[in-house]
Amino acid sequence: MVAAWVAADAPHRLIALADDRVVGYVAVLNGVGWSSHVGELRLVVAPDFRQRGIGRLLAQRAVVEALELGVVKLVVDVVAGQDRLFDMFTKLGFEQEGRLRRHVRSTMGDTHDLLILSHFVDELAASLASPAAAADDDA
């Protein structure tokens, strides 16, 4: 598996490749105005490549990128019921800050709550650099 920055004109995006196939994507989008210190993390992993640690690795790399960009607070949206994704982000130190009721509509027309998670990047970067986090990565 190889991870590479997409292009010089999109420095806040990272992809994961397997045999020249894009199997994961993460982006850090900068906030504007009063929220210019906030970055939004977006993460997608191909269904057949989930549960392999790709999402966690991409999220960790996005945190490092956010820190380098000067982002203070990083937020991510998770659809309620995506328990594994929610658990992954909480293990990285994110906390739920809000819930938007019936905010997401599926292709089948069902509505779901949207959970808003956040973490201050400097705290998260310190936890990722800890010996305990390194031991988790070896598992």
List the predicted regions and their residue ranges.
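C-terminal "cap" of GNAT-fold acetyltransferases
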Residues: 39, 102-139
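Catalytic cores of nucleotide-enabled group-transfer and carboxylate-activating enzymes in metabolic
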Residues: 1, 67, 84, 96-104, ...
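Short aromatic/hydrophobic contact patches that present stacked aromatics
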Residues: 42-44, 75-77, 116-118
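Conserved active-site alpha-helix within GNAT-family acetyltransferase domains
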Residues: 22, 56-57, 80-98
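Conserved catalytic-core motifs of GNAT/GCN5-like acyltransferases
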Residues: 75-78, 90, 95-112
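Central antiparallel beta-sheet cores of small beta-barrel/beta-sandwich binding domains
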Residues: 12-13, 22-26, 63, 69, ...
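Acetyl-CoA-dependent GNAT
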Residues: 1-48, 59, 120-122, 138
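Conserved acetyl-CoA-binding loop-helix of GNAT-fold acetyltransferases
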Residues: 51-68, 87-91
